[in-house]
UniProtKB/Swiss-Prot annotation:
Keyword annotations: ATP-binding, Cell membrane, Kinase, Membrane, Nucleotide-binding, Phosphoprotein, Transferase, Transmembrane, Transmembrane helix, Two-component regulatory system
Species of provenance: Staphylococcus aureus (strain Mu50 / ATCC 700699)
Molecular function as annotated in GO: ATP binding; phosphorelay sensor kinase activity; protein dimerization activity
Protein name: Sensor protein VraS
One Pfam family of this chain: HisKA_3
EC number(s) reported in the record: 2.7.13.3
Catalytic reactions on record: ATP + protein L-histidine = ADP + protein N-phospho-L-histidine
Transmembrane residue ranges: 13-33, 43-63
Amino acid sequence: MNHYNRTIGSMLILVYSMLAAFLFIDKVFVNIIYFQGMFYTQIFGIPVFLFLNLIIILLCIIVGSVLAYKINQQNDWIKTQIERSMEGETVGINDQNIEIYSETLDLYHTLVPLNQELHKLRLKTQNLTNENYNINDVKVKKIIEDERQRLARELHDSVSQQLFAASMMLSAIKETKLEPPLDQQIPILEKMVQDSQLEMRALLLHLRPLGLKDKSLGEGIKDLVIDLQKKVPMKVVHEIQDFKVPKGIEDHLFRITQEAISNTLRHSNGTKVTVELFNKDDYLLLRIQDNGKGFNVDEKLEQSYGLKNMRERALEIGATFHIVSLPDSGTRIEVKAPLNKEDSYDD
């Protein structure tokens, strides 16, 4: 309303000022007879002088209202641009449905650099947030990794050694002549200790995984299989094609292999696990398969941390992750990762 009042008032002052100046300058036009005629002559029963004033006021109101409406449009548009700028949007005049006056454009052109500076500040804030997150993420991962290493050392130095000692003692006892029912219970105890040792090795593999370091993916998997062949009663075989794999996905695939073998050792109750790695020209295929008891995939996929971790690692490198498992028919895990031939030769 302030714009309307100011505009109409200004127009009234302007019109009456011009009329007064005109009457003052034109001495001939201003005379007693004229004023008498203005007061005594009527239009629609209204004196001409009063009628003309009403017409002037009405015209000022109409014209002033139109001008005030236009000014309000300009101000509302500028206000909208400022609000958009504060909300992080890019200001512009391409989406406006009103005529923009030159004065408004001058104000808008002053606003554009401010909007650009706000955008830069937001980007800097995001970068700082990301940097802080990355720093904190690295610290957290380092803390977790150190704690996993510590737990692995303690388990290896205490529980693993005790299980080994118990296994040796049971083997020695078996060599002696035992009376029933001890002769039947000792093999059961020995089997329990062996299962515990297998579980412990799988747990240590999970807590303290081997790294590729300077090895290729194929070399790392071969070394892992050879190491397991010496330590676990399960038969571990491999069929590995050694080829160049982009460094960005090698570590993820190796961790998936470790996780899959660890789960097999702990839960499958099988006698054999096979690890395969093939180059299929435009993609690689990693397959881990066992002949264990199998499981219900739909139930385990959401409950098992290991399976979810493998799937997430596969998705991070743009690979597909499939599990096929049937009761008493074993489990097969397949990961297919795309290969970029140009990138595969970049170290």
